[in-house]
Swiss-Prot record:
Annotated transmembrane regions: none
Similarity field: Belongs to the universal ribosomal protein uL23 family.
Protein role: One of the early assembly proteins it binds 23S rRNA. One of the proteins that surrounds the polypeptide exit tunnel on the outside of the ribosome. Forms the main docking site for trigger factor binding to the ribosome.
Protein name: Large ribosomal subunit protein uL23
Species of provenance: Corynebacterium kroppenstedtii (strain DSM 44385 / JCM 11950 / CIP 105744 / CCUG 35717)
Length: 101
């Protein structure tokens, strides 16, 4: 069982989308987070993992879509996203690591 005291258990993955790339230029980063985590836990986790200062955290719950399968209807899991805005003067986060070469 994972522990919410470990910051890497709260932040699951960065969101890779056109909108999230546009927000990165403004200092706002989007992450998939655990559904039972709150804004304070997300803020502490981002500050510990990336070594930055967070000014605000906005969260949104996305309901899973209902999809047709050959056996009837199925459902994708619901997710929670966190949009984290860094404080002014904070270094940008290198989410995707260094160069591939």
């Amino acid at each position: 069982m994972s522990d919410l005291n470990n910051p890497r258990d709260i932040i699951i993955a960065p969101v890779v989308s056109e909108k999230s790339y546009g927000l990165m230029e403004q200092g706002t980063y989007t992450f998939l987070v655990r559904p039972d985590s709150n804004k304070t836990q997300i803020k502490i986790a981002v500050e510990k993992i990336f070594g930055v200062k967070v000014s605000s955290v906005n969260t949104l719950n996305r309901e899973g879509k209902t999809k047709r399968t050959r056996f009837g209807y199925g459902r994708r899991k619901s997710t929670k996203r966190a949009m984290v805005t860094l404080a002014a003067g904070s270094d940008p986060i290198d989410i995707f690591g260094g160069s591939a070469s």
